[in-house]
């Protein structure tokens, strides 16, 4: 009887565990960049392959090739043509997916560039790009093609000669989070300022937990991407600058929303750098920024709230954290399907009384938790978040993902950041 029971346990364990993908079996040391174009409206979208570029060494994880996170609005996955195995996946969001929630997307079709990096396979692979369906909350295939690493049309030309500075090196990239800062709106004469700004941003990052305790898990790089003119576009003030990333305020007609709409330009800027995460420092005193998961983070260089905005936007772009505020103006409409759980680790729709961080809540904490200052510092379920005052909930009374006044991240966001760092480092 004991032998029979042990056999059953072993069988169940085998089916419950995912086989680890051997990096060296399927991939070489290089990185490929897929330049894509996403086009459509709020109701439909299509993806087109523009070009493939051979870049430097792959700097991402080599131990968890299939991402453990069900994050983002899109997933890119690689399947071996030889044996059918799923050998790589990662997820991301995009400015295009945000635009599809605006009023404009109901009136006109638009196209946005989107570049995705993958490890270079040794043999042919099937590339499957999936979208998260609003109706179900699940991923569904959107675009597929076969990639042959021996294809002579894969570009190998140098796209720029921007200098890459090593700011902090704590070890091999495959065991670290490689964060690259890129200059936007800095002329050649302003590169000394950019280097000082990078050092300041690095100080901001490691001044707050959990990054402060995890500094040894990061490598930091800086790309001296030179612009012809200083600053950035401010369209509603009729200010236009010739800059390397073509960034601008007034994205989706929101004054503070600072982005670089042409994602391909940003990808080209950092083509010679190792990176897991990209952060663009924009040379301006005007308040604004943006952060999009596994896409980029971007914000102003010289404002009294530069530190707070940087840490907030990096929370979006690196850890997939959602916005916990609900009172500021945004252009989005119907961002979340309230019948399903949001993918962001710090938001919940509380359907059926379920929520992601239940294990972190004290049994004496009332659920839902009243929005009262006496519950500050308590992990709970507070109504209001994700741009909506009703039916979307956040885990804390205040947090860096809610306001610039919060002293730091709440325990739920801290846990999510730590898990993302672990993914890249372990």
Give residue spans per PLM region.
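Short pre-active-site segment immediately N-terminal to the catalytic Zn-binding motif
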Residues: 191-194, 289-313
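Beta-strand-enriched, solvent-exposed domains that form extended recognition/catalytic surfaces
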Residues: 27-152
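Bacterial Sec-dependent N-terminal signal peptides
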Residues: 1-22
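Active-site-proximal segments of metallohydrolase catalytic domains
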Residues: 217-293
